Design a protein with these regions (language model features):
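N-terminal catalytic cores of NTP/NDP-binding nucleotidyl/phosphoryl-transfer enzymes
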Residues: 1-2, 8
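Active-site cores that bind ATP or allylic diphosphates and position pyrophosphate for catalysis
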Residues: 17-184, 189-402
Length: 402
């Protein structure tokens, strides 16, 4: 569904990020840049920025890659004082880059888009890549803004509004899928944000019109995705608890070897865990100043997926992803596909079965690919069970062509 939405939004080609999407921003960026660089035909990388320029990202990236002695000294002092690593890193960077004014670095490094953008630049510098970075600065609402406004609402606000409509209206006024699919709602797939803003401003205060207004703004080809999202047919963190329970019941002796897990965290997990805990209860019990809740979620996901340091960590040092799996493409992208096949220095997979043939020798690549397929199958099985349908094997998944 995401591939369909990306293609309908104007993308020519959609490539899977594979299992590296479950890792931290550093590994996520390293894998993404590794794929793009090895395609052999990518000139530019664009990413979101709240307000910073490419030069700002480059300055931080160089500092964090080189780690001069003064930086390491301040970093250690701040860690010993009780600061978390992100706080200590921002303080040290601010002292070196802005003449002992850490507040500038703290402001920069607290933004999620800046953290990811910084890792993109670090990955480009580490690979000596010829790909040129380009920032797209945010317009409209801030990343964390939770209210719809006239121009460029945040994704957070849109998600919350979707929940609001479903909770208050959808059971009484279900979306008219037939009307939307017939094109009568006027959705052409263009300027969706403007339609949302206009309809929101004109009808939001009229409760009886609200569901119809939201339907008109977001129906058509987007409706199945929205309906599934609102009806909770997608996988949530809580859906993973039975798998964590099972892993713990096995009394796994190597829990400390899962990717992102350390011995201290493993001990806390074993001390806190008890049958009947919710996923959020577990996160709350594991919460510590030294690790973010997002990192905790990733670690627990890696336990569910049985992802250990090897081969994941070892492979990421050099070639983070040994293949690029194409999920979908537009009919007009044939020249791009041809250029990729001519220039790519990694395997190009268009059908999952191709990967099965390529990586059947027990190598690290084979293990990574099997984890990727297993992850997709697990997600599909949970989602299918919640939706009351039969799951589709990842090996039978077809490319999306638009």
């Amino acid at each position: 569904m995401r591939t369909q939405m990306a293609l309908s939004g104007g993308a020519d080609l959609v490539i899977e990020m594979a299992i590296y999407a479950t890792a931290s921003a550093e590994y996520f960026a390293t894998a993404g840049i590794g794929i793009l660089d090895q395609l052999g035909c990518v000139d530019y990388l664009s990413f979101g920025s709240e307000w910073a320029e490419v030069e700002d990202f480059s300055a931080y990236a160089t500092l964090f890659l080189e780690e001069p002695e003064k930086y390491k000294q301040i970093l250690q002092e701040q860690l010993k004082s009780g600061k978390s690593f992100p706080e200590a890193r921002a303080f040290a960077a601010g002292n070196l880059l802005f003449d002992s004014k850490p507040e500038k670095a703290i402001e920069f490094l607290k933004e999620p888009n800046h953290i990811l953008g910084l890792e993109y630049i670090k990955a480009l510098q580490r690979r000596n890549s010829f790909i040129r970075p380009v920032v797209i600065k945010r317009k409209g609402n801030h990343y964390h803004e939770n209210k719809l406004t006239e121009n460029y609402s945040s994704a957070t606000a849109i998600r919350q509004e979707m929940y609001h409509f479903y909770r208050n209206f959808s059971r009484k006024n279900p979306y008219n899928t037939e009307t939307c699919n017939s094109g009568k709602c006027g959705n052409t797939g263009k300027n969706t944000n403007n339609r949302v803003s206009n309809i929101y401003n004109n009808t939001y205060n009229k409760e009886k019109d609200a569901p119809q207004a939201f339907e008109k703004a977001l129906c058509g080809e987007y409706l199945p995705f929205i309906e599934g999202f609102l009806q909770n047919n997608f996988v949530t963190w809580e859906d993973l608890m039975p798998y964590l329970d099972y892993t713990f019941l096995l009394k796994n002796k190597v829990i400390g070897k899962y990717f992102g897990m350390n011995l201290d965290l493993a001990r806390r997990f074993q001390n806190i865990y008890e049958p009947g805990l919710s996923f959020e209860d577990l996160i709350e019990g594991l919460h510590a100043r030294q690790i973010t809740d997002a990192a905790l979620r990733r670690v627990l996901l890696h336990i569910v997926l049985h992802m250990k340091y090897y081969p994941f960590l070892e492979e990421a040092k050099d070639i983070p992803v040994p293949y690029a799996r194409i999920l979908g493409f537009s009919k007009s992208s044939s020249p791009l596909l041809k250029e990729i096949r001519q220039n790519a220095t990694l395997d190009i997979i268009q059908r999952p079965a191709e990967g099965k043939k390529l990586y059947s020798n027990g190598s690290a690549q084979a293990q990574i690919y099997s984890i990727d397929i297993r992850t997709a199958d697990l997600y599909e099985q949970i989602a299918a069970r919640k939706a009351g349908r039969k799951p589709i094997s990842e090996y039978k998944r077809q490319q999306v062509i638009r």
